[in-house]
Amino acid sequence: MAELEPGVALDRLCELSRRMLAASDLDARLTVALASLAELFDVRHTMLFVPAGDDGLTTIASHGYPPGGVGASVPFGQGLVGMAAERKRTLTVTNLERGLNMVRAIHASASPARSEGRDIPFVGIVNAQSQLAVPVLIGDELLGVLYAEDTRPGAYGHRHEQVVEIVAHALARDLSSESEATVQHDAAVAAPGGALPLQVQYYQADSSVFFDGEYVIKSLPGSILHRVLHDYVESGRVDFTLKELRLDPELQNHIGRDNLDARLILLRRRLQERFPFVRITRTGRGRFRLELDRTAVLQEA
């Protein structure tokens, strides 16, 4: 791919910045940022990973891939994504054979078949020949990794790398736990219609959630989903705030310095992709609502 001319790159970067600033929230900014990288800079395939505790990093957003990969995980130190996270610096691969080896390493390490089906398959490009992994940092704190790949050799020049780094910098503050809103919101009650009840299984050992026996999600997003479903089953409540989740003693061990808004986006997108009959929708800054097309029966183990 030809290197971007300085003036062209700057004009397009200004347009990307304008689009991101116009986005209403983090979820929208992620979608706009990745779509604009493809449209304006021909960076066609991108993923954003965020830390997931001991599980390494997990995919929160992607562009240019088939649906189904949100929530896939990559261990720290493995593959280009894991190494960029561990070293906290930008890494690139443009060599064909080395690039293929890196891709194989990512696919081998990402969401392996373990934990009795509690993992989501990685959806990256198997024959990628160009890769770019940029850590999202505030100071020395790792907030994520912005990853790009392409089947074309030499797809990313120096200015492509700079543009992806600038987008990573722009997303850093949004992904910081300090950026979350603390707006209160009143509870509400919902009564979905008469399909067969949704059987929800929750396993406390790894905070994993299953719908009708099918794995949904685990770790902090699983704890959040369990919390709101528990409140819904007990009282019919459907409206919640990020502030109350952060203050919930049952979630304290999971949250740490994690950004709840980012984990909520991961949960929302995972539900959209695989379980559209359960939805997490925004109702305001720092507020969200649980929507179900079926009543739920919760089992805990």
Predicted regions and their residues:
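A short, aliphatic-rich beta-strand micro-motif
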Residues: R118-P121, Q129-L137
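Allosteric cytosolic regulatory segments
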Residues: E165-A172
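Regulatory sensory and allosteric helical modules in signal-transduction proteins
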Residues: P51, I60, P67-G124
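Short amphipathic alpha-helical recognition elements used for nucleic-acid or partner binding
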Residues: E214-L247, L267
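Helix-loop-beta substructure at the N-terminus of cytosolic sensory domains
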Residues: A22-I60, G68-G69, Q78, E178
